[in-house]
Amino acid sequence: MAENILEKIIKKKVEKIENLKKTTKLDTLNELINKNKSFIDFKDKIQKNINNRKLSIIAEIKKASPSAGIIIKDYNPVEIANTYNQNKVTCLSVLTEEDFFLGNLIHISKIKEKIKLPILCKDFFVDKFQVPLAKSHGADAILIIMAGVSETLANELYEEAIKLNMTVIVEVHTIEEAKQALKFKSALIVINNRNLKTLKTDINTTFDIHDVLKNHTGPLISESGIKTKEELLELSNKTSIKTFLIGESLLKNLDKNSIFSVL
């Protein structure tokens, strides 16, 4: 049976991290973390908006994706982050996967030098070593994709991130994954409307899964396929979700995007 895209990405990532661990010492990462004064509480920023009955947008920064190909040819992550900041987004999500999304961890470091917004390291976490690695570059949050990890690895990633005072975002696409994610009490849970195995998007995924998660203690997020302000408001009005992770729809129309007006 042919590998799906998620399996291909994870296979490549495992190889990369194994090689990186041979040349990068954990002590070095911890030194960088201790020197870095840029950290911001990702979850707290979103929770404050919820408490104040405000919507939150986690705006994504990426050059490319397997589904869309090259999104931005002349890619300047810091410039994009600055535009987002001017439009008062709540947090940033920065793609750092190198082979399929053409990202890099250094993009987080460069953005953090200029802009004071919490940043999610959007990547495929396959080893707990990646958690201090992300934090050493200035990341405030990590992603656990339930479709791409074992139960043991999910637990390890969660515990490592909590130990390092990072926000954990757990991504789900099915009811079964949503049920599994509920045990991560302090995590934010994001419903991904895109099936990472087929890359097909259906915004109804959020409605289908929401009921399973509505009693979760942390904030809920919807991501993928949200193209208009009207779609965002429909999701907000019909569910308890008040936080939205949006990438391509913003990146393709950065200057005058009506989605920013919900903030």
Regions found by a protein language model. Give the residues of each.
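Active-site beta-loop-alpha junctions enriched in small/polar residues
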Residues: 12, 60-64, 97, 124, ...
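Catalytic cores of alpha/beta
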Residues: 126-138, 173-185, 216-246, 258-262
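C-terminal helical cap(s) of enzyme catalytic domains, especially alpha/beta-barrels
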Residues: 13, 203-213, 250-263
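N-terminal active-site wall of soluble small-molecule enzyme domains
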Residues: 67-169, 177-180, 206-209
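N-terminal amphipathic alpha-helix/helix-capping segment at the start of soluble metabolic enzymes
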Residues: 1-62, 67
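Conserved, mostly hydrophobic/aromatic
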Residues: 9, 59, 84, 92, ...
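Glycine-rich phosphate-binding active-site loops on the catalytic face of alpha/beta enzymes
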Residues: 133-153, 190-199, 239-260
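Hydrophobic faces of well-ordered beta-strands that scaffold small-molecule active sites
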Residues: 57-61, 92-94, 119-122, 142-144, ...
